[in-house]
Amino acid sequence: MNMRNSDILKLLNGKEMTGRPVDFKICTDKVHKFISDRRYGAFGEAYVYGWFISKIGDLSQEDIKRLGYSSIEEYLAEPFNKGLTKDSEKKFIQWANFKPNWEVLDKINW
């Protein structure tokens, strides 16, 4: 069973899906060059710099556009639209924390 967009809203509202908090990690270093080659994922060749934002709403419109999306909802919905299931929740949490996980990226034909 595919996760629904309503499940994404639970994440956005800071609720727990797995019995533990979900934090989102993002690289917004303005010096870093983002590329559009999707083989590398939504962040291009970006590295994870290790700072966290506690709420996805802390992303600015500039950050969202830099990632190549019109809205944060569109960005978060993409892995679900590509067929991740509730059974893939643990892997999604890794993806949601923006840790490169090539097994998942390959699975969703990134």
Residue locations for each model-derived region?
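Structured alpha/beta reader/binder surfaces that contact nucleic acids or chromatin modification marks
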Residues: 1-110
